[in-house]
């Protein structure tokens, strides 16, 4: 793995091999996180961006949130904490106002181009007006728009391109498993959601076929939440399989994994919930948390 840093003047700096590093993905978090500690012979100039490449392919590109230099008995080290390209949208507020008949093209000119994001993949248009309240981040505006019209979470790839139609599904075939944990949490299962009707009563039941214990919820009309999704979310959260495999398995976004764990069984089509790639004196390995599959 090769790590490069970009200085404030735009010049590049080869950072060398880290003593330790971790790259974290979580489906529920907008940005990936890179944390790395590098040996150094001096205090580095302030870095703006960090890029990690593997065999010519960019694995991570993100903003530097923290740059901490430490002196110990073993010498100087520089710790970097970085977030991927979504951080730019998270850290910037959108200009308050109203956009009539918003489209991705309009949002691109209003929110993205001032931040240097000029390439957008996806199309969407709404017949209503979009009201942006003061203090709302660019990410919140864009994410809500994409989820409402496209049913997908946007993301920024390692080339700085914003994808608004979600990540394509990709197959992960996991080979050797160093360790694994199978966790069942039946307390997360929801047995029934009673949805409020137009008459005001909670008289429309949605039942789970899997729950063995009664755990009931009530859904109001104002919430707008699909009761079937409430049940499905509980089902997803009731199961997790955490595996650790040798090497770097990345990217994980949109991944579905097939894995056979000695003693635990074979698992197919398991969506990736989160993951963490690690580099240290023991080499490279990847920890992946999987949801219930087929």
Give residue spans per PLM region.
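Short amphipathic beta-strand and strand-loop transition segments with alternating hydrophobic
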Residues: 20-26, 65-71, 275-278
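Glycine-centered tight beta-turn/hairpin loop motif at sheet-sheet or coil-to-beta transitions
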Residues: 10, 55-57, 264-265
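A broad structural signal for short, well-ordered beta-strand segments within beta-sheet-rich domains
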Residues: 14-20, 64, 125-129, 177-183, ...
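Charged- and aromatic-enriched interaction segments used to assemble
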Residues: 76-77, 81-187
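Oligomerization/assembly interface segments of phage tail-like spikes and tubes
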Residues: 22-40, 75-87, 237-245, 272-273, ...
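Surface-exposed cap/loop segments at beta↔alpha junctions
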Residues: 38-118, 285, 292-294
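Solvent-exposed edge beta-strands and adjacent loop segments
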Residues: 1-28
């Amino acid at each position: 793995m090769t790590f490069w840093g970009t200085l404030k003047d735009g010049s590049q700096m080869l950072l060398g091999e880290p003593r330790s590093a971790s790259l974290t993905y979580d489906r529920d978090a907008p940005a990936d996180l890179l944390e790395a500690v590098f040996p150094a012979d001096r205090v580095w100039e302030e870095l703006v961006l960090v890029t990690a490449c593997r065999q010519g392919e960019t694995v991570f590109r993100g903003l530097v949130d923290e740059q901490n230099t430490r002196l110990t008995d073993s010498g100087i080290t520089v710790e970097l904490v970085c977030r991927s390209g979504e951080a730019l949208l998270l850290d910037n507020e959108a200009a308050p106002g109203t956009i009539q008949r918003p489209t991705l093209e309009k949002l691109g000119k209003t929110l993205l181009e001032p931040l240097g994001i000029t390439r957008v993949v996806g199309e969407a248009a709404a017949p209503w007006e979009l009201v942006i309240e003061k203090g709302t981040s660019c990410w919140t505006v864009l994410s809500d728009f994409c989820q409402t019209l496209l049913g997908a979470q946007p993301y920024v790839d390692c080339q700085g391109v914003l994808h608004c139609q979600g990540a394509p599904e990709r197959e992960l075939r996991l080979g050797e498993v160093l360790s694994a944990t199978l966790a069942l949490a039946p307390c997360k299962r929801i047995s029934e959601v009673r949805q409020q009707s137009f008459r005001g009563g909670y008289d429309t039941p949605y039942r789970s076929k899997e729950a063995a214990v009664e755990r009931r919820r009530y859904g109001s009309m104002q919430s707008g939440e699909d009761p079937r999704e409430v049940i499905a979310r509980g089902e997803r959260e009731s199961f997790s399989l955490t595996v650790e495999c040798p090497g770097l398995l990345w990217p994980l976004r949109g991944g579905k994994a097939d894995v056979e764990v000695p003693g635990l069984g074979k698992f197919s089509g398991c969506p990736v919930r989160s993951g963490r790639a690690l580099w240290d004196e023991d080499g490279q390995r990847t920890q992946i948390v999987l949801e219930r599959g087929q």
